[in-house]
């Protein structure tokens, strides 16, 4: 299904229903000589074409020959060549500047150059293809827009909402992996006012089809996603997706990935439930440090790189949309202008001057050629608008979404860093408190030993010590310090960190000065703090292991992601350059043909 062919674009053709050259669109004109092309123009065009091929060779290098893929997909040795799908190996065409893949076809100059899905960094359309999109009836008898996926000889139809639920499930199952984005949902008000219709919204469906195809192939390129059972079930027609969402591992996902193993969140250990939950909003990225400074530095640099990408791509996307609007307006003006020229060229039929008929015929023919040149400009501009959307606007929008997803993954690591920081700080405070209590206990022991020695030598000192002990015991009985409740294993004196509810039922005396505690309370608090330290040390080992897994997994994910960004950006620039050169070449050739005809007029 070609979005350009089946859209309402051809309704804008002012020559539809006539005998004009472009009555059926520019795609109806066969490759080769135009009906108004003379021999002189052929020679001139060959010279122009040779010069142009030399220029393209300097820009893009030599194109390698096509090669077949063992998986039956689209492959290419470089950006310059593209193969044919299985069963059509005889229809392989060199992918030069004038050839672009459209829906599994190789089209030549003068035909629609609108690919169904822009190639990846290797010039391939990927292992997964969405071969059809339209209305279908699901297993529950509901009618919806379905997208048929072809993969490894099997086909399965999924709805957009199922793609969305797949991505959400993958984001929760793989919090350390950058999950490729999908096209955004339409506003809810749009569905009330104008529900999506397979006949009237072909362009929207085709755009989603292209972007969802990119989503599937990007997921397939990532090993962690490709080998995950949920992704494999999504591509398997034997599974009903609504049932997959109600069965493990999706159904047993934790509500908070911070309280679960980062690489296997469906199997949390009891210690994970003891970890603190840092706040979602964070003000700075690099404040909490771990015991892996090289990873800290690397991910801080990645955060800066993603921010730069976002700042660069945002204005490019806005500019591409603006240019698309301008070219649409230009194409509309050219359509009107071409129609006027063609109508004016027919005036020779109403002019009856026998002695000047030859000059009038030549003049009408020249005017007609000018009109045809304007028509070529119009149709080429329409194709350029379509290519700007597919080859520039869509991939840049996808890259922006990708950058946002990368920053979300970095935010997850930041929260794990804060968990590490909270546990490390709490351990240090507990050890400091134990040391303080033990030092005070030792000082009291030394003081009591000195007083005991002096009391044996002086009865007056002994009576004074007994009186002070009685007063101190009376104050301790009135003091409510023993009734204080603690607020969690990781509670500090400032008390700003939320902790799990299971750790909020034990008494704490950490807010009381050590000199106000009795010997029994000090001993009890030391025993409690030592018990807490055992759990904290286990949590510390756990968070260290989690951070190591997070760092290694995210490093692999970002290695792929940064390469993807660089390759996609290079591919976008090259495809956009090819599109502009095609547009300029078509327009220039049409005007050269018109000029040759004009030069033959006898003045």
Swiss-Prot record:
Membrane-related topology note: Peripheral membrane protein
InterPro entries, alphabetized: AH/BAR_dom_sf (IPR027267), PX_dom (IPR001683), PX_dom_sf (IPR036871), PX_Snx41/Atg20 (IPR044106), Sorting_Nexin_Autophagy (IPR051079)
BP GO annotations: autophagy of mitochondrion; intracellular protein transport; reticulophagy; retrograde transport, endosome to Golgi
Keywords, in A-Z order: Autophagy, Endosome, Lipid-binding, Membrane, Protein transport, Transport
Segments of this protein annotated with the region Disordered: 1-36
Pfam families (UniProt xref): PX
GO annotations of cellular component type: cytoplasmic side of endosome membrane; cytosol; phagophore assembly site
Chain positions recorded as a 1,2-diacyl-sn-glycero-3-phospho-(1D-myo-inositol-3-phosphate) binding sites: 159, 161, 185, 208
Subcellular location(s) of the protein: Endosome membrane; Endomembrane system
Domain of life: Eukaryota
PROSITE patterns tied to this protein: PX
First-listed, main subcellular location of the protein, grouped into a coarse class: membrane
Domain PX per the UniProt entry, residue ranges: 121-241
GO molecular function per UniProt: phosphatidylinositol-3-phosphate binding
Statement: the UniProt record of this protein carries the keyword Protein transport: yes
Comment text on domains: The PX domain binds phosphatidylinositol 3-phosphate which is necessary for peripheral membrane localization to the perivacuolar punctate structures.
Family membership noted in the UniProt record: Belongs to the sorting nexin family.
Protein function: May be required for cytoplasm to vacuole transport (Cvt) and pexophagy.
Protein name: Sorting nexin-41
Primary gene name: SNX41
């Amino acid at each position: 299904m070609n979005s350009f062919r089946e859209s309402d674009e051809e309704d804008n053709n002012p020559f539809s229903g006539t005998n004009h050259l472009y009555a059926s669109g520019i795609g109806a004109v066969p490759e080769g000589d135009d009906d108004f092309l003379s021999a002189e123009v052929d020679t001139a065009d060959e010279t122009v074409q040779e010069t142009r091929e030399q220029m393209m060779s300097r820009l893009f290098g030599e194109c390698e020959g096509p090669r077949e893929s063992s998986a039956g997909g689209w492959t290419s040795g470089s950006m310059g060549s593209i193969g044919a799908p299985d069963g059509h190996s005889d229809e392989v065409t060199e992918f030069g500047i004038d050839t672009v893949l459209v829906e599994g076809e190789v089209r030549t100059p003068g035909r629609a150059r609108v690919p169904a899905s822009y190639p990846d960094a290797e010039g391939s359309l990927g292992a997964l293809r969405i071969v059809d999109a339209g209305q279908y009836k699901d297993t529950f008898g509901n009618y919806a827009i379905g997208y048929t996926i072809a993969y490894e000889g099997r086909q399965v139809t999924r709805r957009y909402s199922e793609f969305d639920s797949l991505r959400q499930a993958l984001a929760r199952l793989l919090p350390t992996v950058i999950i490729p984005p999908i096209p955004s949902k339409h506003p809810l008000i749009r569905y009330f006012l104008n529900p999506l219709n397979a006949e009237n919204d072909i362009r929207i469906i085709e755009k989603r089809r292209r972007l969802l195809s990119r989503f599937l192939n990007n997921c397939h390129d990532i090993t962690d996603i490709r080998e995950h059972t949920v992704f494999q079930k999504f591509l398997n027609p034997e599974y009903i997706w609504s049932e997959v969402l109600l069965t493990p591992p999706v159904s047993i996902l934790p509500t908070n990935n911070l309280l679960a193993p980062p690489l296997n969140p469906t199997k949390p250990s009891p210690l994970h439930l003891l970890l603190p939950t840092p706040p979602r909003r964070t003000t700075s990225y690099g404040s909490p440090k771990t015991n892996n400074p090289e990873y800290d530095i690397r991910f801080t640099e990645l955060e800066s790189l993603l921010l730069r990408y976002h700042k660069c791509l945002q204005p490019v996307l806005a500019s591409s949309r603006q240019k698309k609007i301008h070219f649409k307006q230009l194409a509309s003006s050219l359509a009107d202008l071409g129609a006027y020229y063609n109508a004016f060229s027919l005036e020779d039929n109403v002019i009856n001057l026998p002695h000047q008929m030859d000059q009038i015929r030549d003049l009408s023919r020249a005017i007609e050629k000018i009109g045809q040149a304007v028509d070529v400009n119009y149709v080429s501009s329409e194709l350029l608008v379509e290519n700007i959307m597919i080859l520039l606007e869509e991939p840049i929008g996808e890259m922006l979404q990708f950058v946002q997803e990368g920053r979300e993954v970095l935010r997850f690591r930041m929260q794990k860093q804060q968990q590490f920081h909270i546990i490390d700080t709490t351990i240090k405070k507990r050890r400091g408190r134990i040391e303080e209590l033990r030092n005070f206990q030792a000082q009291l022991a030394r003081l009591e030993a000195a007083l005991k020695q002096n009391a044996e030598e002086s009865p007056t000192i002994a009576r004074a010590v007994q009186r002070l002990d009685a007063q101190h015991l009376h104050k301790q009985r009135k003091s409510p310090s023993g009734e204080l409740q603690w607020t969690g294993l990781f509670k500090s004196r400032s008390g700003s960190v939320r902790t799990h509810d299971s750790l909020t039922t034990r008494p704490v005396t950490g807010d009381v000065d050590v000199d106000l505690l009795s010997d029994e309370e000090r001993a009890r608090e030391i025993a409690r703090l030592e018990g807490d330290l055992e759990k904290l040390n286990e949590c510390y080992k756990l968070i260290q292991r989690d951070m190591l897994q997070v760092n290694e997994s995210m490093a692999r994910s970002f290695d792929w992601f940064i390469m993807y960004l660089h390759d996609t950006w290079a591919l976008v620039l090259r495809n956009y350059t090819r599109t502009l050169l095609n547009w300029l070449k078509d327009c220039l050739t049409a005007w050269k043909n018109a000029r040759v005809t004009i030069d033959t007029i006898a003045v």
